[in-house]
């Protein structure tokens, strides 16, 4: 399985018409099935697809349950500026990027509706929270872990991890890396 941005209009990053694409191979990468969209918002909340971009995905396979998770940043109604500069403190989807998940229990063939976990993991003082870089892992005790990054209240970039100890039902941010 491989996840990536599907950028329809140009190479421009969020905010733009961007969906999360997934390619699936069952023969070690010799051939690939038709692209799937585990996260795509299209026209949502009265706004066009270009105002509902979702991208920069990270993937995690829960090796204990064989559930695949994809996490990405969704930018709803933030104009045409880049998400790094048009996402603001708070939690409202019209003003701050949302962190969303989708899960598959059939090896990436089908995907759940988006699961918005912003309220679980974002500090309201932060400007922007998103996943990555990199992919997630399953710890030996079953804890699911994704890398994250965020812009704090002073506009300083930070990195860390978010984790779930209950198979993805709830998520928390761990102490983040500081220099």
Regions found by a protein language model. Give the residues of each.
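Asp-box/BNR beta-propeller blade signature and adjacent active/binding-site loops
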Residues: 1-179
């Amino acid at each position: 399985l491989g996840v990536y941005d599907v950028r329809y209009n140009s190479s421009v990053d969020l905010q733009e018409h961007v969906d999360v694409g997934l390619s699936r191979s069952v023969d070690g990468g010799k051939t690939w099935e038709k692209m799937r969209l585990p996260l795509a918002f299209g026209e949502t909340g009265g706004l066009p697809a270009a105002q509902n971009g979702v991208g920069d995905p990270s993937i995690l396979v829960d090796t204990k349950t064989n559930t695949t998770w994809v996490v990405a940043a969704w930018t709803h109604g933030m104009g045409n500026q880049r998400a790094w500069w048009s996402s603001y403190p708070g939690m409202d989807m019209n003003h701050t990027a949302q962190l969303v998940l989708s899960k598959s229990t059939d090896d990436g063939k089908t995907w759940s509706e988006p699961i918005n976990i912003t309220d679980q993991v974002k500090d309201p003082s932060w400007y922007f929270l998103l996943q990555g870089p990199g992919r997630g892992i399953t710890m030996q005790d079953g804890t699911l872990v994704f890398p994250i990054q965020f812009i704090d209240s002073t506009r300083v970039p930070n990195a860390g991890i978010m984790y779930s100890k209950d198979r993805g039902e709830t998520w928390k941010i761990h102490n983040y890396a500081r220099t």
